[in-house]
Amino acid sequence: MTRSVELPQYSVRLEIENASGQAGLEKQITQELQSRNFNDMQLTVVEASQFKIRKAAKSFIISREENGDAAEQLALRLGLDPSCVIYRELEQNSEHISATLVLGKDFLMSGRFPARGAKS
């Protein structure tokens, strides 16, 4: 008997930067993401940190890969508009990060994550 194993369509190694101004939000979001099951996406949070240089009003995703399909799919699953995804290469990317989620002040207020059980 041959068994087939379905691999996820998207694999995202995620860095989270908290630019919302609320200390610890990056840790809460990391825990939330790790408890989620995104059907066709393997999501690994590689790093999470507080962004100390400046605050961001709006959340966005930086695709670290030229093909931004996985980052756009992640945006949809997080309740963000895929147009918020920009591309910027990450130099010296030893962690093989494929996307960076920058949490802005809007993320805190909006309840961005779709409800559990909602199609993701």
Region spans (language model):
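Gram-negative outer-membrane assembly/targeting C-terminal domains
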Residues: M1, G104-S120
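C-terminal solvent-exposed extensions
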Residues: M1-E6, S94-E95
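Second-shell loop/turn segments in exported
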Residues: V12-A23, A56-R64
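BRCT (BRCA1 C-terminal) domain core and associated BRCT-interaction motifs
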Residues: K27-Q28, E32, R36-M109
